[in-house]
Amino acid sequence: MQGTPPTMKIIENILKNHFSQPLSQNISALTNNYITEVQNFFPLSKNTNLVVGQILNFQKIQGSQKLNLVEVNTGTKVVKIVCGASNLQNGKKVIVASEGSFLEGINATLKNKKIYGVFSEGMLCALEELGISTKFLTPQEQEGIYLFDDPNDQIALGSNALIPLGLDCFILELGLTPNRVGDLLSHLGFAKDLKAVLSSQSSNNNQETKSTNYKTKNSEDQTNPDFFANLPQSPLKVQIENDSCYEYNACILENIKIKPSPLWLRNALLQSGINPINNVVDITNLILIEYGIPLHAFDSENIKQIKVRKALPQENITTLNQNDFVLDENDLVITDGKKAIALAGIVGLLESSIKPTTTKIILEAAYFSPQTIAQTCQKLKTKTESSLRFERGIDQSLIPLAFQKACQLLVTLADGKITYQPVITKQKNRTNPTISLNLDFVTRKIGVSLCPTQIKNWLLNLDYQIHTSKHLGPQNKNEQLNLQAPLRRYDVKIKEDVISDLTRLYGCHKLPPQTIQIPTQGKLTLKQKNIRELRKLLVNLGFYETITYSLISSEMFEAFTPQKPFIKIMNPLSQDKMILRQSLLSSLVEVLSYQHKRQTFDTAFFEIGKTYFPNQETLSLAFALNGHFLNSLWHKQDVSSSFFVTKGILEKISAFLGITLTYQKTQQHSNFHPGMQANLLFNNQIIGVIGKTHPQLNTKYHLKESFLCELFLTDEILNTTKTFTFQPIPKFPTVIRDLAFLVDTKYSFYQIEQTIKQTTPFDLIKCELFDVYQIPKTKEKHSLALRLFFHNLDKNLEKQDVEHCMEKITSNLIKHFHIEIR
């Protein structure tokens, strides 16, 4: 499957859980300059001036059946508000909008006014009036105004009402480059990078000071070793039968109550592009976006064991979103010992999904091989939030933390009870390669002299492991460090990747500009010039350039280059893109077919691109014509595309390249008309083909009559230096004679032309074919009309000289081709 790199929405309320200090006010600029591109930065809610109030009492307004006058304590004063909600309750805390408040749901700024003769000092708000969609609200939340559930009286009167709703925060949308999808597709991954940036900023004034000003919260980023203490051993058996599963953790939770998640959790998921489902599934999705660790929960009523194995050949599964798939032994499944209950790392199955009646679950946290997950997703043409993270690589060291955090939330938000210790089965740990980094090399690459201690501190802030313990002072610039990137960083493999991280922390925008030191001024090579000028020539001739994929289908390959060794992609994106092309004509036929299906005719396209063979790549030029080549308003007749027009364009190209091509009649190309195709020869080597499309090809690809030509642009051709020979202006006139004759169709004009030139090598300067006439009664002969140009630089040709030449030409043509003069 092919797609653009994903974006990641960072939610302030989740991000600040991982910082012990308030977040920087210029977080957007810091992110854009030091981490990755910021695509958007905006407040989660546009609502303003909303506070928490408490209903003291309410009474009906005289003359109205629904309206009540409500006395509300806003913490600083008591206000009277007219409200028509049916769910008013004394003592309940509510959302109060006063004069000047802006409500996103109704897109209005409030003003105090009289209603039924009673002055109203604001408005009590429903969630819908705050712009929250009712689709994911409970029936109770949709009924009237919103009533805070605050049994412990933790929400202060007069405080910002958006805070307990989880709406008082910003959204930072990251545009992720492919190499950073793995570690920045989570709040914790971004928090760790942001911590490194903030720490490096605080140490810029004192390079020798260690950067320890910004730390992530221990309570959020470390496991509690006592959380599962004093629990009995689990009866659940876990067995891993495949190396693609490095680690599998499972925990049984009982007494689960399936219900909607708290509003703050639903809002967080919605802002991340994930629809809330129920509290259990929502908790696993929260862990997904916060820690980057995919989890899965099974309804475990009938599950006694977990077995991770390869899928069986032709094994059928139905996913929880009711998609049916047929698997093979290259896929990985989670089973209950007998049947599959999940497609590993991608999606759960319908039978074991969480239902409204579920009371007992098994929570799964595992590490699966990125290659295995990616191959299965490509084959099945499916992708999920979980598979995206697994195939890009997750941080295996975070699995225990994410697993424990999910268990805590299941106890808190789903009334779950952990009755047994989790089952932890680990086969192996993923490691990053050790990289040797020379500090002098860092300076040369970045172009800025960095203090060795500063380099070390920056690497430590980024969670690199440095395996050298030597003191890094100002004089040790040539010291070599052996280090490893953190497990979340799958993109750091060589020393240049490490230098890229150091450059980010320094700030690419702060790198001083330097003049490039090169011995000579750069210029285009002769080959590059010829390619560029060739493009201009074809555009000036009325062609449109196309740029097509290098990958084609096996069907298209067989049509143009059958029975040849080819290069096939191991994991093609689709069946239409699986073989590297050996001819540009296959791509041009697809372009013509696309145009003709949309009733676009009279087209002329060309492409200059690479073709691929087992041992080499070749640059080629191909062009295609169909319909009218020239649509003229000034001439009486349009110029239609034909074999001769195509040949004329090719002659223009060969003249531009300074080469002489010869034509060899052939019938070896099945996609061309058998009577109208020729190989192109240069120095007696076949370097191309020209011809008219075969009627069967036209039918198959919905083409009108078209003409194609392809020419291999070898280095010899492109590196040919065009030479120009200047001649004086002729002093003597040119003599022109026409010659028409009947000749067998088996003889080509090229053969006849060569014979004529050999007969009069000096005075004949040009031979043109200006008419061809097919005899109606026979297909064996046709009439050719030639125009011959005679000229001599040294003298004026006499009539008898020209007649003598014409006699020699005629006799030679009769001798070799048995012509009949007309």
From Swiss-Prot:
Subunit structure as annotated in this protein's UniProt entry: Tetramer of two alpha and two beta subunits.
Superkingdom field: Bacteria
Domain tRNA-binding: 44-162
Textual note on the cofactor: Binds 2 magnesium ions per tetramer.
Organism: Onion yellows phytoplasma (strain OY-M)
All copies of domain FDX-ACB, residue ranges: 730-822
Subcellular location as annotated: Cytoplasm
Record keywords: Aminoacyl-tRNA synthetase, ATP-binding, Cytoplasm, Ligase, Magnesium, Metal-binding, Nucleotide-binding, Protein biosynthesis, RNA-binding, tRNA-binding
Domain B5 as annotated: residue spans: 430-513
Protein name per its UniProtKB record: Phenylalanine--tRNA ligase beta subunit
Family: Belongs to the phenylalanyl-tRNA synthetase beta subunit family. Type 1 subfamily.
Region listing for Disordered, in residue ranges: 201-224
EC number: 6.1.1.20
UniProt-annotated binding residues for Mg(2+): 491, 497, 501
Cofactor(s), by name: Mg(2+)
One GO MF term: phenylalanine-tRNA ligase activity
GO cellular component: phenylalanine-tRNA ligase complex
Reactions performed catalytically: tRNA(Phe) + L-phenylalanine + ATP = L-phenylalanyl-tRNA(Phe) + AMP + diphosphate + H(+)
Single GO biological process annotation from the record: phenylalanyl-tRNA aminoacylation
